A protein has these predicted regions:
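Active-site Asp-x-Gly
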Residues: 1-11
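Glycine-enriched catalytic-core subsegment of oxygenase/oxidase enzymes
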Residues: 1-2, 15-19
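Short, glycine/acidic-rich hinge or "gate" loops at secondary-structure transitions
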Residues: 18-28
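Regulatory N- and C-terminal appendages and interdomain linkers associated
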Residues: 25, 31-124
Length: 124
């Protein structure tokens, strides 16, 4: 599921960052000792929060491109009934718009999947 993919990514990303703390953006010397470890956790949390927000916006753009662009989503194309396909595309575009314009509304990935379920239920 979407929630599992994000949770695994987040966990593994943090594991790798903690195991290999190298690079110019977050030099190890800045994060030594207990205060440094706390500061690093705070930096990691902030970085992942920004990455998550950006990922939501990117996902919204991809959803729009796959609905309106030339590279259509094959799952939508397989819906033979044009009215049903159009309804699915409208729901997809609605969620995509919200992901782009209101990413802060979705603090955790479960809120994204819950919103998708709400949009589907409202149009049923």
């Amino acid at each position: 599921t979407t929630e599992e993919v994000w949770s695994r990514f987040e966990r593994r990303f943090l594991e790798l960052w903690s195991a290999y703390p190298t690079g110019d953006a977050y030099p190890r010397a800045l994060f030594e000792g207990q205060p440094g470890r706390a500061a690093l956790r705070e930096a990691q949390t902030g970085y992942l929060r920004a990455l998550y927000r950006d990922a939501l916006g990117y996902a919204g753009c991809a959803m729009i491109r796959r609905t309106l662009g030339l590279a259509h989503n094959i799952d939508m194309e397989w819906i033979e009934d044009p009215d049903c396909r159009a309804a699915c595309e409208r729901r997809n575009l609605r969620l995509a718009r919200e992901l782009i314009l209101e990413p802060g509304r979705f603090g955790v990935i479960a809120q994204v999947t819950a919103r998708a379920t709400e949009i589907e239920a409202a149009s049923a």
